[in-house]
Amino acid sequence: MANILTYIKRNWFELLITFCLFSNLYSYTFPSYIYYIGILLIMYKMTRYQVRFVRKNVIYVFFILAIWLSTIINAVYDIRPILYTLILIVAAPFITGVKWHLYKKKLLHNIFIGFACTVVVSLVAKFQGVNYQVTKRLGESMMLYGCVDEFSGYAKFPMWNSAAAAVSMLYFAYLLFREGEKKRWTRIFYIVMFLASMYVCIISASRSAFGLAVVLSVALLKWLSPNFGKLTKYVVIFGVIGVLSFPFFMDSATRMLQKQEAQEETGVTSRDFLWAQRMAEFHSSPVYGVGFAVQGTDENQTVGRGESGSSWLAILAQTGVIGFVIALILWCKTFTRLRNIRYDSENVLIYALFLFFTVHSILEGYMFQGGWYMCVICWLTVAVVTEAKMYRKYLA
């Protein structure tokens, strides 16, 4: 308990930011302005550090210019481009410094704790029988139609809940596999929390988030356990746990399996309609896009919050080929060999999260939805990976 109180005392500001950001996950419970307070707190913290413009990362400036070019040409009068620009300024690696980089790592460390807390909140909601997907969003249970309800707990959307649980899986895989942790009960706690995160991810019914989390957890085992004996030990442990818990997890995965069966029967995925919309928007304005935060074409065009179905298609539709090519270049520049950032084991975890965002952004709007807390975390992750390479000679 004393260690926990000491940690809170030393990290209270970062924990406050984490709370503000994660309030966005529970939009039925907390007012939306709390999330924006979190962004303002990060901006305030940035002013306390010495930062400079990094010329080698000028591509981010071009990305911002592409967004504003599309916004101005299409006469999109909305505050969202301003919000997104501010997020990139505080999070992306084109205005930064060594100490600001270290602070962003500290903030991400607390954000990972936030993901762990979402799993606990989801378990409490499950125990209490709370599922806002049914009671608040849909208004009725899908069991009335012979289906199984997706679980969101106190969160607004099951997908948001599942993505948070998937990141929590990565976090506890990292804590379990890293060198230096020898206490038996601590390792048992990590295993329990990993399995709890897996359970929440499964009942929230996102196949892609769950599959990616499992693959990257195995990758973390490989990256953090170079010793063959240690690697074998964990394979055996999780093999036994997997065999014993298989019936329980399969029973919990009913909704996930139903979605897979429906896709196989119809040949239609849950993203097809959204992807068709994005492509229609792209075809209507292929060079510079339809404008930031714009959905639809012609008389059906709206400005505001909407489900994009894919970060990359949203960028293509809203900023056209110009913005898409720039985004692709800056994202590819982030990839690195693990040895370039391995001087700090936490960089390995953050790189695993970057890979999660890389793949899952094909299906979700992490990169391009400034009103979603995952957008801030996504760009913080990109920045820390990029800066870890850039400042290696100072920190290794």
Map each language-model feature to its residues.
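Alpha-helical transmembrane segments of multi-pass inner-membrane proteins
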Residues: 108-136, 156-223
